[in-house]
Amino acid sequence: MSSIALGVNIDHIATLRNARNTEYPDLVEIANIAVNNGADFITVHLREDRRHIRDSDVFRLKDNLNVPLNLEIAAIDEMLAIAIAVQPECVCLVPEKRQELTTEGGLDVKNMFTYLMPFITQLHNHNIKVTLFVEPDINQINYAKKLSVDNIELHTGVYCNHNTQNELNRILEAAKHCYTNKIECHAGHGLDYQSAATIARVPYISALNIGHFLICEAVLHGIGTSIYKMKKVITNPL
């Protein structure tokens, strides 16, 4: 099988930093360690409440990375302006609720279609690729196709929480549907070594986004070691 890309989300490095409002750990330093150990791109989620990643983090990462920056944002005007100023290689549009601990599900592309169209057009006009974070649902992918997005990221959280064949089948079918419609397919949310190995075997998925689990593993084994192991797991799944 072809090599699958690993995106490392470093949001919770910022969570650790912000716990004491210090300047350490430094996100750029951590991002470079991630890249040196197999990360193909770096992902950060700039939330409306700035609970972890700050505006300045995004600009610093863009200026200091030698791999693509994948910026996750809510589809609101404030974030659009920041994305255009930063010029990340890719923006991933995600749903966002202030009270949630983490992103709880995919975008409802069907109901947001009219709103998303000019938003995506503006990003494309600034040569920024666009990903939509969606449930593994054929109907949602069909609407995403009409928006001419570059990528779909399939929400793997339900599969990771319940590990059912039915949910895995949904991911398989959604990835195949992306391929049929010439949309690059990524996946992420809740992945650990075991679930990432399974999802990495799904045909037509070209990249995985993994964050919280890797940061937790880093507490025990170090960030470099944890990312190196994950890259090995997903590129050589049994």
Swiss-Prot record:
GO BP: pyridoxine biosynthetic process
Entry's transmembrane regions: none
Enzyme class: transferase
Disulfide-bond pairs as recorded: none
One Gene Ontology term, aspect cellular component: cytosol
Protein family: Belongs to the PNP synthase family.
Function: Catalyzes the complicated ring closure reaction between the two acyclic compounds 1-deoxy-D-xylulose-5-phosphate (DXP) and 3-amino-2-oxopropyl phosphate (1-amino-acetone-3-phosphate or AAP) to form pyridoxine 5'-phosphate (PNP) and inorganic phosphate.
Protein name: Pyridoxine 5'-phosphate synthase
Name of the gene: pdxJ
